[in-house]
Amino acid sequence: MKVLALGGSGDMGRMAVSILLESPNATSITVADNNYERAKHFVDLVGSDKLKAVEIDVTEKNKLIELISSHDFVMNTVGPFYKFASMILDAVIEAKKPYVDICDDWKPTLDLLEMDDRAKKAGITAIIGIGASPGITNLMAVVACSKLDEVDDLITAWGYGTGERIGSKLSLYSIYNIVKLKVTDFWLKNCLII
């Protein structure tokens, strides 16, 4: 399987590509980045014959569709997701290729879920939000809810400290997302899969 790793030389992309390299199903992995030198440096550092580097500006739709079309599967770690997720999934649907991403923003998640019918009509599977949070936290929520008689609301969130050992504070961005990531029956039924 020829895998296209959009953002494959970024922080999260490098980890995902490293894991993909262990899969016998991934016969080749194209590390695509808006900075060719960064992608090439990562590919050279890893030193696997399975990897190659390409430069892509994901805002250039026709070039993106052409690149996607030459692969069997797309993994997207390009951020920020509020800026790029919808345009990338739109191109993936047009190219009719299976897709996964690690979208961690609530608003683009809702936008991506709105593309469900288009993805189904294109005959593709698109799985969004398969990182740590959302992703693992959503699966943990499903397990937790299955152990309870009734669930009215469920809130998942992640946060990080300021680096202080005592009295660490969440960033305003994290607080904003905690408030917005109120998960109800809708999220559990949809499991963030389109």
PLM regions and their residue ranges:
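N-terminal Rossmann NAD(P)H-binding glycine-rich loop of SDR-like oxidoreductase domains
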Residues: V3-I19
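Short, conserved SAM-binding/catalytic segment
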Residues: F42-L51
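Active-site-lining helix/loop region of Rossmann-like oxidoreductase modules
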Residues: S146-I194
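Short beta-strand element of Class I
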Residues: S28-T30
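Conserved Rossmann-fold cofactor-binding substructure of NAD(P)-dependent oxidoreductases
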Residues: E55-S70, T77-P80
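Rossmann-fold NAD(P)-binding glycine/threonine-rich loop
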Residues: I102-T125
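Helix N-cap at the beta1-alpha1 junction of Rossmann-like dinucleotide-binding domains, i.e.
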Residues: G10, N35-E37
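ADP-ribose/adenylate-binding Rossmann-like module
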Residues: P80, A91-T109
